[in-house]
Amino acid sequence: MKRVISALAAVFVFAALFFGIMIPAGLPAHAQTDELYIYNWADYIDPETINDFEQYYYEQTGKNLNVVYSTFDTNEVMLTQVMNNDERMDLLCPSEYAIERLVRNNMLMELDKTKLHNISNIDQRIYDKVDAVFDDIVINNTQIALSDYFVPYMWGTLGILYNAQIVREEDIEAGYGILWNKADNKKLDKKIFLKDSIRDTYVAAVLYLKEIDALPKGLEDKSVQQLINTVNDTMLEAVENALVEQKPFLKGYEVDYGKNEIVANKAYVGLSWSGDAVQAMEENEDLNYFVPEVGGNVWFDGWVIPKNAPNPEIAHMFIDYFCRPEVAIRNAIYIGYTCGLDREVLRGSAETVAILEEYEYDIDEYFNNEFRYPEIDQEQYGVMKDFGAMHEKAVAMWERVKAKGSKTWILFVIIGGVAVMGGGIAAFIAVKNNKGRRRAKVMVNNADVENNEKTD
């Protein structure tokens, strides 16, 4: 299914967004206008759900609402902004380890779950997993449950997206080694993407070292959960050496355009989040995804409210709205990821089923898809924790890795950036709807157009 916006309409919309022209939203101009400031990953929400919430807010309160939506491309960028109080924020959507750091720094408000009437729709397994991992947070001699500070938004796994027409069985058997082209597939040279994200890349490198029996001494018998959260000088050195070794096979580091390059057959392998992989597989039937046998990372992104949020009441209302099955599923379809609601709650909602059928999904296939709904209780999946006191050393290691061959890398970034900018402008002209996934880059309430997607 495709929907094409007329060129004239597109020019008007682009001009309105670019120059800040106000487009009437159909709400009474005389009503009081409240504001809600949201800081989220780019391309990580359906803009129509923002508009719907503004309308819902008016119906509930009799007041207009202006959602001011801005974006970040990594947890580290978000954390810097929050720690420096550089942004006015009511709602953030960090990953679990970033939530941990914010909680430890006493920067988040404990949620008032009496105001979250739909909280029972959340998949309890997520809270159980998170609280089991983050069981050592103590503030003022009181143990803190991370689940008291966030509501799950999206979740998934970290694995490998690949082109099955190019990748051979021996490449897959290499596990994370495929990112290092261990099976010596000449077609993969300079056709492999790695995430421009220290946390995701660190996980891949650590588990690759485990695959090839190259872990530092004494770590051989540790679980995946323990390994991906082992950050010391010895492990950092081993990871750095492995990542430098990988660079000759690399097409680039990315957080947004790699998936599109693989869909377009311009690259053949990439470290990928499961949601991006599902999107890509729907667009190119030659693509597939797997989590290597050695194990992987299961991640969770969630809504949190900063302690200094100017509008916490509206923030609670927004979180609760996104815990409604029909809202959650339509938003999940748009961005391609798995929402934090219990799948049985979703499956049991007639409205949710109708929405999935509207977008031509098979209901059983959707909810039984192992990429959307992996068994997160398995020991093969670890959850990332904050680097803690080793954060600066880890970041320095990552910068050294990226600096290797920097002249070539800078040129690649410039070329990639121009391509991304071109893609962002083109998105105003045509909106692609693939099984209901409208992948437009849309500016919401005069927020800047950005083309970055989820990363750690």
Name every feature range the model reports, one short phrase each.
Residues 31-105, 409:
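Early extracytoplasmic/lumenal segment of secretory-pathway proteins
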Residues 44-47, 103-261, 266:
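Extracytoplasmic ligand-binding site segments that recognize negatively charged/polar headgroups
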Residues 98-101, 269-286:
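A ligand-binding cleft/hinge motif common to bilobed small-molecule-binding domains
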Residues 19-32, 427-434:
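Sec-dependent signal peptide cleavage junction
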Residues 89-94, 251-252, 268-273, 288-289:
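Paired acidic/hydrophobic, glycine-rich loop segments that form the ligand-binding mouth/hinge
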Residues 119-121, 240-244, 283-307:
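Periplasmic-binding protein-like
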Residues 368-455:
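Conserved C-terminal helix/tail region of periplasmic/extracytoplasmic solute-binding proteins
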Residues 297, 306-379:
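Mature extracytoplasmic/periplasmic domains
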